[in-house]
Amino acid sequence: MKKITLLVLGIVFSSLNIGSTDAPAELFILESNGIHSYDPLINAIFIHESGGDQFAINELEMAVGPGQVRQCRVDHYNKLMGTSYTLSDFFSFDLTKEMFLYFTCHNGNGNPIPPKTYEKASKDWNGSGPMTITYWNNIKALL
C-alpha cells in the first residue's frame, strides 16, 4: 500500500510542472473519510439524554431512543421530509443522528441554513427557554 501511495504521489507531483507558465495543475482527493464535525456533540447529547441507551424510554415525556425523540418532533420531521417514520423508528442511533443533522442544517420550515454552532444545535435539540442554558452546560461538560 505504501508503494502505491508513493507511486500516486510521484505521478501527481511530476505532473505539477512547477515553474511552468502553463495552466495551473489540478489536485484530486482520491479518498476521503468525510467530515464528521458533529459526531462529538451527537455522542454527548446521546449520553446526556439516554446514557447512550438506544432503547431508552422516558414515559413521562413519551420520548424514546438515544436522543429522546418525542412524537411532535417525528411529526415535524415527517412533514418536512415527506417521510412516514413512527416514534419507534427513533430507537435507531443512525436515524436519530440523521434527524439531528437535518435540524442542525435546516430551519423550522425546512430551508437550508448555515450549520449551527455546537451550543445552538444542542439548545435547539433540547427545546427553548432558560433551561436550555443548563442543558448546554451539561452537554459541554461531556464534550
Listing of model-derived features with the role each one plays in the protein:
Residues 4-13:
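Sec-dependent N-terminal signal peptides
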Residues 16-21:
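Signal peptide cleavage region of secreted peptide precursors
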Residues 22-143:
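Catalytic glycan-binding domains that act on GlcNAc-containing polysaccharides
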